[in-house]
Amino acid sequence: MAKLTVKDVELKGKKVLVRVDFNVPVKDGVITNDNRITAALPTIKYILEQGGRAILFSHLGRVKEEADKEGKSLAPVAADLAAKLGQDVKFIPGVTRGAELEAAVNALEDGQVLLVENTRFEDVDGKKESKNDPELGKYWASLGDGIFVNDAFGTAHRAHASNVGISANVEKAVAGFLLENEIAYIQEAVENPERPFVAILGGSKVSDKIGVIENLLEKADKVLIGGGMTYTFFKAQGIEIGNSLVEEDKLDVAKALLEKSNGKLILPVDSKEANAFADYTEVKYTEGEAVDPGFLGLDIGPKSIAKFDEALTGAKTVVWNGPMGVFENPDFQAGTIGVMDAIVKQPGVKSIIGGGDSAAAAINLGYADKFSWISTGGGASMELLEGKELPGLAALTEK
């Protein structure tokens, strides 16, 4: 990576500003999945071990008005982080700027940590965080000693005050270990893969992944399509899809992608269908691609799993983004499980999950430790797979 990293700067005695991604699910004040906190620990610990004073920034959820602050405080995160680090994490509830925060920052000693309250609390008054308000970025930068570490891959595709804004106002803006690893795994897989390179794309909408499909058709040897967007591709070919999800305004796009794919684009050949999305009374497999009238496809079928298994045989690089079906429902998770099985059994394969629902599927279904890398950022990984430059990365200091 052509950007400076946290190992390239002197940290001892310095107040080091760190953008982490602590946007974790919180229910009734309890964190239900702490993976993102765990993922940030190597960078935080390194700063503390080097004698730095870590000042952490993160958002949590969306905050547009005062009422949205309810349940969005980073207080539970501060407690969880303190337990993981085995030391106190200083935190002032509700405070993102002002004399109280400045006093707490200036009182930090070497090896100590402070977590600033949810950066999106600044969005209540004019979206200052999300719109990268110059004054806010400059203010937050002033809290440190000229060093900013961006370790939040999950927001690297956004230009916010807490990443791009701070970067513009410090002497050195560098990458943390998580950001460095995310870029290395995903960019390397797409730009310089060991072949055969197979990409697997699922999820519900073609519209979300047009750019990704176009880029991967150029870079990958095969692109497998599953999930709800299958049926837009089916309908584009005149195949009956019953009541399945379809994007009518993307039929021409789907048809064009198929025509220019030179056979690289591989679609399912059967589905598991039900007579309703939720309160269904009948579930069955289709004979072929066509979905029966009154039914909708909610997973790929056994013939498709076998076809994808064959397509993955011998693969040395696999990038997967998007489940094959409604994996949250046990009736429609066989396709996602079948594809995961097909990926992880390949000898010596570098297997990468591009965050989002695919990551949730791997974690919830017990496959997390079988993949080479699971990205912490769905949107950011999608933009990397599309070949786009990430603002949060572009803002870092060149080596």
From Swiss-Prot:
Pfam families: PGK. GO terms for biological process: gluconeogenesis; glycolytic process. It comes from Streptococcus thermophilus (strain CNRZ 1066). Gene3D superfamilies: Phosphoglycerate kinase, N-terminal domain. This is Phosphoglycerate kinase. The lineage of its organism: Bacteria, Bacillati, Bacillota, Bacilli, Lactobacillales. PROSITE patterns: PGLYCERATE_KINASE. GO terms for cellular component: cytosol. Keywords: ATP-binding, Cytoplasm, Glycolysis, Kinase, Nucleotide-binding, Transferase. InterPro entries: Phosphoglycerate_kinase, Phosphoglycerate_kinase_CS, Phosphoglycerate_kinase_N, Phosphoglycerate_kinase_sf. GO terms for molecular function: ADP binding; ATP binding; phosphoglycerate kinase activity. Monomer. The gene is pgk. Substrate binds at D21, F22, N23, R36, H59, L60, G61, R62, R120, R158. Pathway: Carbohydrate degradation; glycolysis; pyruvate from D-glyceraldehyde 3-phosphate: step 2/5. It is found in: Cytoplasm. It comes from the Bacteria. It catalyses: (2R)-3-phosphoglycerate + ATP = (2R)-3-phospho-glyceroyl phosphate + ADP. Its EC number is 2.7.2.3. HAMAP family: Phosphoglyc_kinase.
